[in-house]
Amino acid sequence: MRAHDIGALALLAVLAVAGCREGQAVELPPLPGSAVSLDSLGQGVVDGFVRGDTARLRGYVLSLDEYRDVWPRLQIDTTAGFGFDWSWRDNRLRGERAFRRYLAGFHEMSLTAVETRCTGDPHRFEGVTVLPGCTITVRDSSGATEEMRLFKSVVVIGGGHKIFRYDD
């Protein structure tokens, strides 16, 4: 075999492998602190606020590095001047305000998450799915249930579930 034949075979092999990947979903590993399911995320959030477990609650929110990795995958139009820095600051400010309010309001209440649902159409991106329209149905000690919106959207990466921020 001549050198250019070997090069051509190598190129064909690379193209064949690349062709096998085309159209397949990118599978990323779950992020640290992710919940294994939507219901476990809702239960973890409710339990965290009731118990005042700030480390657990903060672990469910995308960190700066995670947000930095997810942001470009979302294909957000930044031509209006609302780029990554603005989005990160806005999420942190609004999320922290809601976090403090829920932490004070739910501490030591007798609440159990019954169901967590996201009713919006899923948005799929490279290795990331965003589930909008999320609510948690909670039950109190009297048996009464209420639907709450502690976060609006869930980010699913590698089967793990996290949130952008707590919503007010």
Model-derived segments and their meaning:
Residues M1-A18:
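Sec-dependent bacterial lipoprotein signal peptides
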Residues C20-A55, G59, S63, Y67-D69:
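Short, low-complexity N-terminal intrinsically disordered segments enriched in polar/charged residues
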Residues A16, D53-T54, L150:
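Generic detector of short, well-ordered, non-transmembrane alpha-helical segments enriched
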Residues P72-E147:
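Surface-exposed, charged secondary-structure patches
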Residues R21-V26, P122-D168:
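Short beta-strand edge/turn micro-motifs at domain boundaries
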